[in-house]
């Protein structure tokens, strides 16, 4: 049972990772640093202006030293809690008169949407001196109204020695009570930072809780206007050029009018096979409407042909060394055939894996007798029929090889699954 749970958990983690990767690679996430970090908590943005990356937004784990300088990979923490003021209980406030009964007095919280943080408080309960009863009193946490904010609050109090999800508890005079508030941000705030007051009902004590929703990048607040890196035709924002309306390209180097377009997005679309395809098939960079492929072996108008993707033969060579790889398909030299150019047409027979049938050992030469000319019986197969039978035999062998390969893969998968179950 534990093995099955482990296997299911593993599959769930893999699926979640793939989903996050898709969100980070989406069109919206590539538009800006802010859009990137909002796409998913695992997304990060390369703010290195000299990076050659086509997609600046990626899973944080995908960045390498070669693709982006490590300290220039921007990935804010999903939750940050910072205590701003923390005077101890029973000390005097700055006015020299008021006794501190709630600690801390000011806390700032930064949260990404769909994430939460827990803030801990202590409260010193003191009854009215005129009250003579020694019976426990009810303390109740109160806060500002959060109805019109994207916040969701949960309250916990250490009550009777146990942490309970509640807003109230019966306490004794001079008892120090610990309580916690869990803050969840459901979405970005349209009004900026949110200020909450946290106190105890009917008590003269209060603390400030300041919540900031992380829905953008700090670097977006400090653009480099008319940057030289953008040919002075745009602003450098978080390592990426935001071009003037008349310019396009990674570095604003392309005048749109010269390329027959009016928008930068139209110029980029010239590097797509269709509207849903990635720029340059994700194998190159778009330079003023033309693809420049990342590797010499990648070709095509949209870098759609990978000339390293042809099958390897048993001899370890692409196209068996008897042809060239053209856009993922072997184009065989004269005298060779099959998908991997492994079969010689001269032998008229080729076994599996492209290995020619062994030639017969040399026999002593003998002069064959001249056969007598005889008429061919009507039921004897013609040469074309024999060739047809050979082709059918070859096809049958290929089907048999393919079937055995499938069975082999199924067996491997079953063996792996059984090993996991026994783990």
From Swiss-Prot:
Comp. bias regions, Acidic residues: 380-392
Positions on the Cytoplasmic side per record topology: 422-423
Glycosylation sites per record: 65, 274, 307
Cysteines joined through disulfide linkages: 24-217, 33-43, 36-68, 46-57, 219-238, 230-241, 243-252, 254-288, 271-286, 280-291, 293-303, 305-327, 310-325, 319-330, 332-341, 343-350
Cited InterPro entries: I-EGF_1, Integrin_bsu, Integrin_dom_sf
Family annotation (SUPFAM superfamilies): Integrin domains (SSF69179), Plexin repeat (SSF103575)
Matching PANTHER family: INTEGRIN BETA SUBUNIT, INTEGRIN BETA-PS
Protein name, per record: Uncharacterized integrin beta-like protein C05D9.3
């Amino acid at each position: 049972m534990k093995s099955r749970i482990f296997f299911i958990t593993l599959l769930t983690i893999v699926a979640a990772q793939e989903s996050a990767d898709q969100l980070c690679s989406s069109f919206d996430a590539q538009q800006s640093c802010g859009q990137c970090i909002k796409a998913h908590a695992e997304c990060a943005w390369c703010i290195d202006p000299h990076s050659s990356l086509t997609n600046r937004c990626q899973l944080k784990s995908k960045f390498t030293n070669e693709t982006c300088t490590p300290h220039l990979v921007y990935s804010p923490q999903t939750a940050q809690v910072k205590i701003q003021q923390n005077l101890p209980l029973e000390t005097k406030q700055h006015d020299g008169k008021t006794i501190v009964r709630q600690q801390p007095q000011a806390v700032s919280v930064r949260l990404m949407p769909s994430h939460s943080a827990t803030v801990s408080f202590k409260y010193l309960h003191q009854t009215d001196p005129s009250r003579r009863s020694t019976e426990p009193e009810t303390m109740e946490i109160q806060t500002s109204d959060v109805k019109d904010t994207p916040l969701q609050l949960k309250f916990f109090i250490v009550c009777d020695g146990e942490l309970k999800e509640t807003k109230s508890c019966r306490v004794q005079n001079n008892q120090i009570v610990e309580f916690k508030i869990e803050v969840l941000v459901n979405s970005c705030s349209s009004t900026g930072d949110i200020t909450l007051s946290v106190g105890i009902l009917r008590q003269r004590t209060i603390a400030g809780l300041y919540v900031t929703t992380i829905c953008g990048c700090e670097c977006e607040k400090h653009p480099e206007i008319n940057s030289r890196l953008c040919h002075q035709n745009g602003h450098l924002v978080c390592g990426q050029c935001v071009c003037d309306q008349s310019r396009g390209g990674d570095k604003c180097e392309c005048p749109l009018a010269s390329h027959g377009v009016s928008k930068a997005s139209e110029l980029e679309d010239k590097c797509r096979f269709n509207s849903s395809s990635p720029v340059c098939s994700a194998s190159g960079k778009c330079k003023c409407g033309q693809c420049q492929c990342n590797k010499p072996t990648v070709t095509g108008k949209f870098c759609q042909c990978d000339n390293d993707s042809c099958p390897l033969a048993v001899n370890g060579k692409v196209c068996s060394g008897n042809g060239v790889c053209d856009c993922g398909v072997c184009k065989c030299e004269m005298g060779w055939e099959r998908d991997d150019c492994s079969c010689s047409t001269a032998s008229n027979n080729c076994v599996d894996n492209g290995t020619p049938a062994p030639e017969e050992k040399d026999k002593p030469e003998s002069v064959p007798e001249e056969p007598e000319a005889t008429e061919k019986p009507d039921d004897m197969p013609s040469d074309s029929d024999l060739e047809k039978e050979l082709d059918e035999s070859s096809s049958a062998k290929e089907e048999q090889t393919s079937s055995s390969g499938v069975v082999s893969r199924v067996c491997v998968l079953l063996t792996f699954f059984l090993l996991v179950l026994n783990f």
